Amino acid sequence: MKDQHNVRGKASRKSAPNFSRRDFLYGSAAGAASAAMLNPAMAAAQSVGVKPGDLPDLTIKEVKVYVTDMTNIHRLNGTETGELVSVVTHSGIEGNYTIGNRNHTTGWLDWAKATLVGKSVTDLLPTLASTSGMKGPGGFDASSFGRPGAGGRTPPGFGTEPQRPGEGPAFGGAAVAGSALQTHGGGLWPNYYIAAADVCLWDILGKAVNRPIYKILQGGVNNRDRVMAYASSNHLPAIEDYVPDALKAKELGYKGYKIHPGRGQHRTGPEIPTYVGHMEIIREIRKAVGDEFVLMHDPVQMYNRFEALSVGRLLDELDYLWFEDPIRTIDEEGLIELGQKLHLPMHVGEFLYSIADYAEYIKRDALGAVRLISDNVGGISGSMRVGLLADAHGLECAPHNWGNEYDMMVAFHLELALPSAYWFEVPHPVEYTDRPYLKNKFRIDKDSYILAPTDPGLGLPIDRAALDKVTKQILR
């Protein structure tokens, strides 16, 4: 027996594969993305077969803001004021992103001058979105959609506690320190400040090696070059508006449609409970588009627990794909209860602002899939950390996507790079996202896919003449 044991042991050791640390890190999509997050400059250089020292000078020389005229441009985010931020290196490479959605551009410029200028992209990227942020779920009242609320975007006291360091099996060292996370659509600093800078830095890094950002994040392992798109509705005025809108999306070639319900009222007639009107929309759309068409429902935290359970049971019955933000994110116990009583997954997370919060909600089964808003979680870097945390726990990660082409492109690079992202949200109609100074537009192909960009960085080359026409002022 002893000899047999020794023989088996020797054979086992002889046949065991000899994995290096590099093989382990780069052997899977999640591992390659994690390695890219630990050392973005190394990942970028390796994507073109050079050393980090061979990259051009990526020291930040200047930050500025283009203030554009939004008079004739449709705004999906009502707070969008049209600012385009710019970060420029000594080698002349420019990174861009929008911060006009947050309406805090002047403060960002002062912060960016002090934080970025004179420092290298290669030094900033691993740590910029790993600084201390704010902890605590948030939310807003839905009174404008027919439900009473306190009138505030975020409840008093939220976002005041110190953030706990992020803890997740996908990261180590500086990358695990947690994203600096805050609020969306006019939230507090530092999250959206950092997010705008982080995206610009990734845009620069991609341009420095002539590669799209997602290629750097994929690490040569995940070769996805397209993502299935679904049409995401606006909050429409009346119940009668939804069926034509969904049928139009189907006619355009989309394979799915997400309902953002409005007040839940008919154009004429007596007022009814909002959630009852939403249930009518849910039934009528399923009847109109057929059983094979994919449908989702996102009331944006509009319901109480009873309403959410009533709506959720109908969604289950009619085979909807997911139920998004059914109740306020702060109601963690309510989310757990709904998850236990409903079959379809609940997409939750747009109003979480730290990786510690995501870890808690995942641990407690308070969500069935992870949603995130990149501006809330530190840009591309913070979003990748949250997405890989989700993947490590076997959960889908679905980035929120609502705004202009810059917002959309960040979400698209994330979906191309994350191993557990499957559907790409496209505001309907998509023309509302277009900006006249950006050459590339988001449009689905005949099979409802959005194809990956081929231009370097974010993949949004600027038409300088068109930008000049709409620029009212350049802030420096």
Regions of interest found by a model, annotated:
Residues 92, 197, 210, 323, ...:
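Conserved, mostly hydrophobic/aromatic
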Residues 107, 114, 123, 313, ...:
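Shared catalytic-loop signature of beta/alpha-barrel
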Residues 38-74, 150:
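C-terminal segment of N-terminal export signals and the immediately downstream linker at the start
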Residues 224-341:
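Metal-dependent enolase-superfamily TIM-barrel catalytic cores that perform enediolate-based chemistry
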Residues 2, 8, 12-18, 23-45:
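N-terminal export signals
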Residues 192, 198-236:
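Glycine-rich, aromatic-flanked loop segments that form ligand/cofactor-binding clefts
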